[in-house]
């Protein structure tokens, strides 16, 4: 009986050893994250950005649809008429990223594609105040990610 049990343990050992050797020489599936980055889907929703027209004018018309549709109530907008033509523009556009659930409703509701969720997922901060985005920060994000945002918005795949 002892001989049988020892043979069973030895068999299990070799099965385990074979598995270890198999995965040791198999192609690696993990990436070294900070140095290597994997592909990002065109549907990915990350850090928010406010876009501008090509002439530099802000796209946001302060319709407040994004504020109304936000289920987390993370968006706050204040509007005022412009002196030049009387159209409304956002004087204050704040997003509390600690409340945001990245649902994309704000992007879908916007009639002029002013607010979008960009490709950036590396925006971790050390304190909470840095996650309260104001209009300037959102416009800077839009300028920084404009080429990637255009690519994401003009994708042919519209199925959900």
Swiss-Prot record:
- Provide the top EC class: translocase
4Fe-4S ferredoxin-type domain boundaries? 51-80, 91-120
Cofactor binding mode and count: Binds 2 [4Fe-4S] clusters per subunit.
Q: Name one GO cellular component term.
A: plasma membrane
- Which is one Pfam family of this protein? Fer4_7
What are the recorded Gene Ontology BP terms? aerobic respiration
Asked if the keyword RNA-binding belongs to this entry, the reply reads no
In terms of Gene3D superfamilies, this protein maps to:
3.30.70.3270
State where [4Fe-4S] cluster 1 binds. Answer: 60, 63, 66, 110
Keyword NAD present in the record's keywords: the answer is yes
UniProt keywords, alphabetically: 4Fe-4S, Cell inner membrane, Cell membrane, Iron, Iron-sulfur, Membrane, Metal-binding, NAD, Quinone, Repeat, Translocase, Ubiquinone
Check the record and name the SUPFAM superfamilies matching this protein: 4Fe-4S ferredoxins
Give the bilayer topology.
Answer: Peripheral membrane protein
Q: Where in the cell is it found?
A: Cell inner membrane
Task: Give the EC number(s) listed in the UniProt record.
Answer: 7.1.1.-
Say where the protein is mainly found.
membrane
Which coenzymes or cofactors are required?
Answer: [4Fe-4S] cluster
Q: What does this protein do?
A: NDH-1 shuttles electrons from NADH, via FMN and iron-sulfur (Fe-S) centers, to quinones in the respiratory chain. The immediate electron acceptor for the enzyme in this species is believed to be ubiquinone. Couples the redox reaction to proton translocation (for every two electrons transferred, four hydrogen ions are translocated across the cytoplasmic membrane), and thus conserves the redox energy in a proton gradient.
Q: Which family does it belong to?
A: Belongs to the complex I 23 kDa subunit family.
Spell out the HAMAP family in the cross-references.
NDH1_NuoI
Subunit text: NDH-1 is composed of 14 different subunits. Subunits NuoA, H, J, K, L, M, N constitute the membrane sector of the complex.
What is the protein named? NADH-quinone oxidoreductase subunit I
Species source reads Neorickettsia sennetsu (strain ATCC VR-367 / Miyayama) (Ehrlichia sennetsu)
State the organism's lineage.
Bacteria, Pseudomonadati, Pseudomonadota, Alphaproteobacteria, Rickettsiales
Tell me what gene encodes this: nuoI
């Amino acid at each position: 009986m002892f001989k049988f049990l020892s043979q069973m343990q030895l068999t299990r050992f070799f099965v385990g050893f074979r598995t270890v050797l198999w995965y040791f020489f198999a192609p690696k599936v993990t990436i070294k994250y900070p140095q290597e980055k994997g592909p990002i889907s065109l549907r990915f929703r990350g850090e928010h950005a406010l876009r501008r027209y090509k002439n530099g004018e802000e796209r946001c018309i302060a319709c407040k649809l994004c504020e109304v549709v936000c289920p987390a109530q993370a968006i706050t907008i204040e509007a005022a008429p412009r002196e030049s033509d009387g159209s409304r523009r956002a004087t204050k556009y704040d997003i509390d990223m600690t409340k945001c659930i990245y649902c994309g409703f704000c992007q879908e509701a916007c009639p002029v594609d002013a607010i979008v969720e960009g490709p950036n997922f590396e925006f971790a901060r050390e304190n909470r105040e840095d996650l309260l985005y104001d209009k300037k920060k959102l416009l800077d994000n839009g300028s920084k990610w404009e080429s990637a945002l255009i690519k994401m918005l003009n994708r042919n795949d519209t199925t959900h």
